[in-house]
Swiss-Prot record:
Protein name (record): Cyclic pyranopterin monophosphate synthase
Enzymatic reactions: (8S)-3',8-cyclo-7,8-dihydroguanosine 5'-triphosphate = cyclic pyranopterin phosphate + diphosphate
Organism: Variovorax paradoxus (strain S110)
InterPro entries cross-referenced by the UniProt entry: MoaC, MoaC_bact/euk, MoaC_sf, MoCo_biosynth_MoaA/MoaC, Mopterin_CF_biosynth-C_dom
Assigned protein family: Belongs to the MoaC family.
Length: 163
């Protein structure tokens, strides 16, 4: 495992200097899910939630979040993102009705977009919670992680499908 890059020789936090790194095509895919009551999933699926189109609003929130990641995470570089896409799948895993969110983020730049993909997923899922909390305060956001990343010196990463 390599050393932490966000600390200088004195142990002080700093933003990593990426000026000498080449701009390469970078892609990151992250996912997560929100578990809920069956009635809540039915509201989302039917489009009858009081606050409107839950997944449409969550998609826009996730896109906005990816673009604002460097404002939220102190040592992240501001990046010119070339693509942010969010997909939602409604499913039942065991006895847990859920919405699974997957975000794909791309750029051509000197640093990766994993944080942007993770932020997009988290904020999209938080938006679902916000829009449905009046009917289901027991929703649970879980399993947020990077599925894959490509580009840069460290190459590709694929999460273990077994978890």
């Amino acid at each position: 495992m390599s050393s932490l890059t966000h600390f200088d020789a004195q142990g002080q936090a700093h933003m990593v200097d990426v000026a000498a790194k080449p701009a390469t095509h970078r892609v990151a895919v992250a996912t997560g899910r929100i578990e809920m009551q069956p009635a809540t999933l039915a509201l989302i699926e039917s489009g009858t939630a009081k606050k409107g189109d839950v997944l449409g609003i969550a998609r826009i929130a996730g896109i906005q979040a990816a673009k604002k990641t460097s404002d939220l995470i102190p040592l992240c570089h501001p990046l010119a993102l070339t693509r942010v896409a969010l997909a939602f799948a409604l499913a039942e895993k065991g006895n847990a009705p859920q919405v699974v969110c997957t975000a794909t983020v791309e750029t051509v730049g000197p640093t990766g977009v994993e944080m942007e993909a993770l932020t997009a997923v988290q904020v999209a899922l938080l938006t679902i919670y916000d829009m449905c909390k009046a009917v289901d305060r027991g929703m649970r956001i879980t399993d947020v992680h990077v599925l894959e990343k490509h580009g840069g010196k460290s190459g590709s990463y694929l999460a273990d499908p077994q978890g």
